Amino acid sequence: MGWLESVEHNRWLSRQLQDLLERGRAAWAPTGFGYFRPDGHLDLDKPIDLAITARMTFAFSLGVLMGIPGCRRYADHGVRCLQTYFRDREYGGWFTAIDHDPNEDGHGVPWSDAGDSKWQYAHAFLILAAATATNANRPGAHELL
């Protein structure tokens, strides 16, 4: 049996995943998941990005499927933020980037002109996140599909 099929490799992969999920918890922001500064803290000078929020939702949904404690809360936060703050209620689709805080109506605020645009790249991650969260039976995930 080679390294890729070994128990040791599976344990190593599991430790790597758990470490990544632990670090990812610090990316939590009111409207999704944000960028990190070099010191590992949330960067308040950068927007909350659709691709990052979707990727984190995907990762935490995988954690739910693997039974890793604490992942449900983060997966649910991601699904809720994608549905509530990123969705463009006027023109459809999802904003590419939004502010850290919602507006007075509780909706996401596009981050300058860049956030108002729609990128297929980011939407692909949203589909991946929604499908994985649906598989993990997270509330509201199926509606994202």
Segments and roles (model prediction):
Residues 1-145:
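Glycan-recognition and catalytic cores of secretory/periplasmic carbohydrate-active enzymes
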